[in-house]
């Protein structure tokens, strides 16, 4: 029978039937007749829907394949064949949009013309017997029932057959053909006799019959029947049992399960030491942009052309000087590097035709800044394995750093709105199915909340910089290429805008492995005076390079313009992930969706619209020393996005470890809040695992401080 089914039915139908049987824990190798019945039922549902459309006038029409008008609305929504969650989502959506009564059981189809759900039946017995069984099970006047048999008979509610005669004849012919094919292989009799009646779930949920036998058979050793096992589980006290099991395992294991009470957890110990410093690959809140609106210059879109055009918008350049030296670096080299960039940009402008890319002269200052010839020479292992004192470099333990307020300010700034639009709404065609309509509605609401967000600017900036750097690393491996740091956006009025943040000069980049490092020097414009928070800028040499006139309430004011210069490095794998920072949008959208789903399941209807449009409602955003912070749904969207973006910008082994280990502690605390009486052993070991990740990373230290606020408020 299984071979016959695979030959006789479309592979897609066979695959759906396999999934359905798997979902209900049935073996298609054993239940071959059931397999054939499911395939037959699926095919009838699909044939019922095929070629039936609704035109612009709302009339039902039949369109055969190959007709150019086939983009009309389908008359029937197919519910059968989808997984249960998706099927119920579609049913709920249809009920919300059409006002139809929600059925108790999943129907097979929805008819948009007659506005009713349809239950399709295919029987090997008398149609009227099967019809009565279906009606008795559904107990709903609203769901339309249509039964077909393998003998060409049919029966439908109130003799209303929904489809035209030709469409129904096509279904009956197909069923007759299946019967003939089965009979010719000697499979029909077994198939006909295997049909059971519709089974309804009793109101009192008692396990009887086959299920009861299976329950009695599927018990752990030492239990005679299901009732004994159920009684044992109901009275089970886990803590003492686990202790006993552990003591049997080994003489060394001596774990006592300690109850986890409100007084048990202590705050995480944050490290002492000098304040932590900025370690992102580009400036965040301190960045300054030189911008052009409605760019239409020759070569628009070519980064070097755009950069030169942006540089021309500023007239306040002055002789640069170091205002905050880098403690360990040769600061005159950073100064000379900036002067070299200005000089070489001037050279380009003097040329008749501006080149598309610019490779910098390999001066001594750039060689120093890019670590040229600084790497120790690699020697083949065979040539030195006889060296007696061969050993790995002694590496210093990382210096402990304390949390500094600047990282919280950075995060707050990332959640704020800017006056530009950083992402466009997707240009997506008309939605066909209700589920697509819900998805695109959620996406549009979410995009509207985050398109102006500074975190979204960081995404687009990160994508651009990483893409440009990876391209240059592959295309110009030996060159010190000058790479402008550019982003594009739209103003509130919808005008296009190109922004220049500064420049990167990349070093030699023969990147064979994913983790091979390419060095680069970044030079970024800013109005932030580094002397206000010198600890934040430990890794930078900061120059004063000009004066910028800014409009303010009292008229124009002049502010010094700074250039933040540092040597940095990245790898192929880091650039690859940097190029995919748009995933942060998807991650935070999914988090918002799960909030909407939770709300929708309580209200039993899709709550997307209410969720985003009820401006008076506030939602929890996070913990602070003051307590639980709340805000609008837009603020929640932007905060979740900023967290995701910072996880990408500040990705590190410390963050990986902290996230994984602190999650365990979080789950225990959550269990306590839910009155689940959690027990723990070696809680000290868990704290150790969390705290060994608290070294010097600003984002990890901030998360640890948030975690402590959460502990304080969660356990009040």
UniProtKB/Swiss-Prot annotation:
It holds the Pfam family Flu_PA. It is found in: Host cytoplasm; Host nucleus. Its cofactor is Mn(2+). Mn(2+) 1 binds at residues 41, 108, 119-120. Binds 2 manganese ions per subunit. GO terms for biological process: cap snatching; DNA-templated transcription; symbiont-mediated suppression of host gene expression; symbiont-mediated suppression of host mRNA transcription via inhibition of RNA polymerase II activity; viral RNA genome replication; viral translational frameshifting. InterPro entries: INFV_PA, PA/PA-X, PA/PA-X_sf. GO terms for cellular component: host cell cytoplasm; host cell nucleus. Gene3D superfamilies: Influenza RNA-dependent RNA polymerase subunit PA, endonuclease domain. One of its GO terms (molecular function) is metal ion binding. Its EC number is 3.1.-.-. Phosphorylated on serines and threonines by host kinases, including human casein kinase II. Influenza RNA polymerase is composed of three subunits: PB1, PB2 and PA. Interacts (via C-terminus) with PB1 (via N-terminus). This is Polymerase acidic protein. It comes from Influenza A virus (strain A/USA:Huston/AA/1945 H1N1).
């Amino acid at each position: 029978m299984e071979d016959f089914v695979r030959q006789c039915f479309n592979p897609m139908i066979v695959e759906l039937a396999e999934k359905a049987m798997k979902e209900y824990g049935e073996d298609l190798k054993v239940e071959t007749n059931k397999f054939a019945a499911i395939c037959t039922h699926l095919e009838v549902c699909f044939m019922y829907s095929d070629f039936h459309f609704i035109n612009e006038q709302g009339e039902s029409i039949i369109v055969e394949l190959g007709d150019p008008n086939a983009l009309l609305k389908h008359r029937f929504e197919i519910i059968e064949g989808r997984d249960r969650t998706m099927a119920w989502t579609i049913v709920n959506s249809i009920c919300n949009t059409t006002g139809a009564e929600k059925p108790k059981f999943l129907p097979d189809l929805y008819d948009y013309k007659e506005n009713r759900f349809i239950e399709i039946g295919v029987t090997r017995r008398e149609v009227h017997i099967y019809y009565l069984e279906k009606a008795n099970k559904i107990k709903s006047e609203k769901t339309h029932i249509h039964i077909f048999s393998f003998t060409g008979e049919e029966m439908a509610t109130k003799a209303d057959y929904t489809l035209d005669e030709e469409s129904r004849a096509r279904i009956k012919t197909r069923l007759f053909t299946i019967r003939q094919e089965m009979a010719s292989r000697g499979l029909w009799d077994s198939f006909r006799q295997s049909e059971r009646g519709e089974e309804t779930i009793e109101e009192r949920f008692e396990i009887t019959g086959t299920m009861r036998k299976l329950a009695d058979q599927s018990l752990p050793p030492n239990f005679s029947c299901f009732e004994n096992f159920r009684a044992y589980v109901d009275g089970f006290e886990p803590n003492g049992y686990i202790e006993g099991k552990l003591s049997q395992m080994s003489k060394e294991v001596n774990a006592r399960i300690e109850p986890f009470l409100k007084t048990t957890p202590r705050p995480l110990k944050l490290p002492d030491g000098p304040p932590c410093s900025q370690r992102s690959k580009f400036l965040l809140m301190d960045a300054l942009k030189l911008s052009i609106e409605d760019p239409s210059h020759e070569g628009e879109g070519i980064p070097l052309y755009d950069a030169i055009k942006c540089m021309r918008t500023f007239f306040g350049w002055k002789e640069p000087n170091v205002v905050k030296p880098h403690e360990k670096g040769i600061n005159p080299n950073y100064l000379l590097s900036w002067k070299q960039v200005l000089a070489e940009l001037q050279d380009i402008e003097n040329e008749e035709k501006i080149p598309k890319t610019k490779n910098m002269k390999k001066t001594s200052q750039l060689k120093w800044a890019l670590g040229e010839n600084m790497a120790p020479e690699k020697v083949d292992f065979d040539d030195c394995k006889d060296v007696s004192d061969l050993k790995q470099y002694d590496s210093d333990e990382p210096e402990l750093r304390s949390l500094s307020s600047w990282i919280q300010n950075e995060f707050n700034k990332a959640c704020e709105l800017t006056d530009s639009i950083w992402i466009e709404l997707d240009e997506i065609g008309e939605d066909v199915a209700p589920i697509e309509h819900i998805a695109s509605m959620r996406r549009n609401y979410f995009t509207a909340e985050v398109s102006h967000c500074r975190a979204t600017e960081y995404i687009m900036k990160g994508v651009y910089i990483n893409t440009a750097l990876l391209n240059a690393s592959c295309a110009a491996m030996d060159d010190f290429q000058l790479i402008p740091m550019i982003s594009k956006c739209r103003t509130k009025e919808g005008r296009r805008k190109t922004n220049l943040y500064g420049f990167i000069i990349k070093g030699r980049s023969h990147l064979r492995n994913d983790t091979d490092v390419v060095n680069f020097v970044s030079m970024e414009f800013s109005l932030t005076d580094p002397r206000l928070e010198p600890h934040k800028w430990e890794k930078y040499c900061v120059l004063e390079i000009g004066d910028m006139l800014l409009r303010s309430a009292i008229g124009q004011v002049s502010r010094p313009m700074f250039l933040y210069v540092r040597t940095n490095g990245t790898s192929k794998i880091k650039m690859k992930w940097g190029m995919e920072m748009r995933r942060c949008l998807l991650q935070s959208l999914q988090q918002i969706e799960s909030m909407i789903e939770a709300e929708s399941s309580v209200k039993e209807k899709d709550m997307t619209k209410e969720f985003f449009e009820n401006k008076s409602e506030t939602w929890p955003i996070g913990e602070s020393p003051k307590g639980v912070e709340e805000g609008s749904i837009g603020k929640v969207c932007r905060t979740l996005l900023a967290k995701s973006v910072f996880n990408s910008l500040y990705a590190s082994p410390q963050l990986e470890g902290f996230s994984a280990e602190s999650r365990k502690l979080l789950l225990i605390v959550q269990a306590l809040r839910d009155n689940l009486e959690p027990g723990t052993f070696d809680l000290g070991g868990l704290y150790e695992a969390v705290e060994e990740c608290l070294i010097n990373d600003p984002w990890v230290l901030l998360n640890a401080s948030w975690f402590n606020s959460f502990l304080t408020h969660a356990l009040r």
